[in-house]
Regions:
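Subtilisin-like serine protease catalytic core
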Residues: 99-104, 124-232, 245-254, 263-269, ...
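Hydrolase catalytic cores
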Residues: 1, 194-197, 211-218, 253, ...
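Extracellular S/T/G-rich loop segment that most often corresponds to the catalytic His/Ser-adjacent loop
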Residues: 143, 329, 355-461
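Protease zymogen maturation seam
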Residues: 32-41, 64-137, 151-152, 502-504, ...
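Structured segments of extracytoplasmic/periplasmic soluble domains
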Residues: 22, 26, 65, 74, ...
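Inhibitory N-terminal propeptides of secreted protease zymogens
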Residues: 1-85
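Substrate-binding/access-modulating region of protease and related hydrolase catalytic domains
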Residues: 216-370, 433-450
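Active-site-proximal beta-strand/loop segments in catalytic clefts of secreted hydrolases
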Residues: 10-12, 73-76, 141-145, 196-200, ...
Length: 522
């Protein structure tokens, strides 16, 4: 049987060096192959992973070792799952949509209030008050790239804050080359997300230092494959963060990840298991609507109702996130736009599965995932009447549930766009400050996550010594429990109102000063 590259992920308390020595030895016992196994990638930036050349049988056996979390094909090489961005053009969602050069990210205004000050209105003209601007903090957008010369990313002197570093040189990884077009965003998604976090008009951290990491698979259709592979991307960030020295030694790092993995199909399922009970499609449930109402397997909604996209997890990517957080990096992740419930480990829906040829645990959310990161669900730009009070509610597309931990505005969010941009996805307008650049309003949990990432930069400016755990505890404690909630955790067909059991906590900041910004929500 031929060998192929596998990622071996060990548990957090396992001595990886000692484990690897066993795998590389000429002889092995137990689940360790009885031969000297060749290293495919030593992963010098990881404390939990090494890539080995194994046969399928050896990989299956090694996965049974009590020290191992998982043995799987590297995410870049998998064909049973796909990487994607968590945003869609606003007009898809049948809400008030469009573009206007006077509009500003309404999340800035909403998250400085303890309750919904918009009521049921779509427009609010007032002041966004702020005292902090992210000075002294390093922000990374891991996405489709960034337009480095966009005016949104300039400092007060008109100089770009985007640091166009070579990630391999900065991390010390040898044998890899960063493409000359790495700092061109051919899509627009990454530029938009960065604008929400650190834009000087649309963003929270208006003076944070900006870094961009274009991720392979997210580059956009016009991009000539200039991104960094998943495997290298996480190592680059960890090692670069650990290598900070001199005046930069104590600068905190915040990473926004508005992307995730999913499984797409145009077929009907054959069977599955819901809360421990097996079912067969066509017998127990004869329509997709009945199946969704009973089990939460989403009906076909995407691409003119022909494609179902389910969230999927990848142990390799999730372990990468844990390693980043352990290194002191603050990680923010978009929950996804798959309409799905994201159950917490051990919850009633965590082991639900559906068979579409392969078996998918569809209520675990999508990778990247970590309960120690900020898993961000999206608030809508419309509200829900609750006994005469207009309450914030979930965006219809948003994945949400006990496996997520905070809500932030994600529908109809105005921010920067790049040139060139993805014409098949976006319809930007001229940037209000310079007609040679673009801005646009789009929706997604992709837009909710960078609201959180931007606010983290403000907290870290105030106290750069905060660990990821300390700051997460503070952010969650400060959040306001005001999202409309049906009170039911399995009303899966109520996708426009139900939180699916997620805490109703909205991102909130108490920072304020006399500095004012006129703002309009549309």
């Amino acid at each position: 049987m031929s060998e192929k590259e596998y990622v071996v992920i060990v548990k957090a308390d396992v001595d990886l060096e000692a484990f690897d020595a066993e795998v590389a030895a000429d002889t092995g016992s137990g689940q360790i192959p009885n031969r000297a196994v060749t290293v495919a990638n030593p992963r010098i930036g990881s404390k939990r992973m090494t890539h080995w050349m194994l046969t399928d049988e050896e990989a299956e056996t090694l996965a049974q070792d009590e020290r191992v979390v998982a043995v799987e094909i590297p995410p870049d090489q998998r064909t049973d799952m796909e990487i994607g961005l968590h945003a869609r053009q606003t007009s898809v969602f049948e809400r008030q949509s469009g573009n206007n050069s006077t509009w500003v990210n309404w999340g800035l205004r909403r998250c400085t209030e303890t309750t919904n000050i918009f009521a049921d209105a779509t427009t609010l003209t007032g002041d966004y008050l702020y005292a902090l601007d992210g000075t002294g903090v390093d922000f990374i957008v891991q996405d489709s790239g960034i337009q480095a010369d966009h005016p949104e990313f300039q400092d007060a002197a008109g100089t770009t804050r985007v640091q166009q570093i070579d990630w391999f040189a900065g991390s010390g990884i040898v044998g890899e080359t960063q493409d000359s077009n790495f700092y061109t965003d051919y899509d627009g998604h990454g530029t938009h997300c960065a604008g929400i976090s650190v834009g000087k008009t649309f963003g929270w951290a208006k003076n944070a230092r900006i870094y961009a990491q274009k991720l392979g698979g997210l580059e956009g259709t016009a991009d000539p494959n200039t991104g960094i592979s998943i495997t290298n991307a996480f190592d680059c960030i960890r090692l670069w963060h650990n290598n900070k020295s001199g005046a930069d030694a104590n600068r905190p790092t915040v990473v926004n990840m508005s992307w995730g993995y999913g499984f797409s199909t145009t077929s009907d399922p054959t069977s599955g298991t819901y809360r421990g009970t097996a079912w067969t499609y066509g017998v127990d449930y004869t329509t997709r609507a009945a199946l969704e109402t009973a089990t939460g397997v989403s009906i076909k909604r995407l691409n003119s109702a022909t494609t179902t996209r389910l969230s999927t997890r990848n142990a390799t990517v999730d372990a990468e996130i844990e390693d980043m957080i352990s290194a002191g990096i603050h990680v923010v992740i978009a929950a996804g736009n798959n309409y799905n419930k994201v159950e917490a480990s051990g919850g009633a829906d965590y082991d639900n599965n559906v068979v579409f040829g392969s078996t998918v645990n569809y209520h675990r959310g999508s990778s990247p995932y970590s309960s120690n990161a900020y898993m961000v669900a999206s608030l809508d730009s419309t509200t829900q009447d609750d006994g005469g009070t207009e309450k914030d509610k979930t965006s219809i597309f948003s994945s949400r549930g006990p496996g997520c931990n905070i809500w932030a505005p994600g529908s109809n969010i105005m921010s920067a766009c790049c040139t060139p941009y993805n014409t098949s996805k976006y319809s930007p307008i001229a940037y209000f400050g310079n007609g040679s650049f673009y801005q646009m309003s789009i929706s997604g949990t992709s837009m909710a996550a960078p609201q959180v990432a931007g606010l983290l930069c403000l907290h870290l400016e105030s106290d750069p010594t905060l660990t990821p755990a300390q700051l997460k505890s503070k952010i969650i404690a400060d959040s306001k429990d005001v999202v409309y909630n049906t009170g039911v955790n399995n009303d899966y067909d109520q996708i426009s109102t139900s939180t699916f059991g997620q805490d109703a906590k909205i991102l909130y900041t108490r920072y304020a000063s006399a500095n004012a910004l006129s703002i309009t929500k549309e």
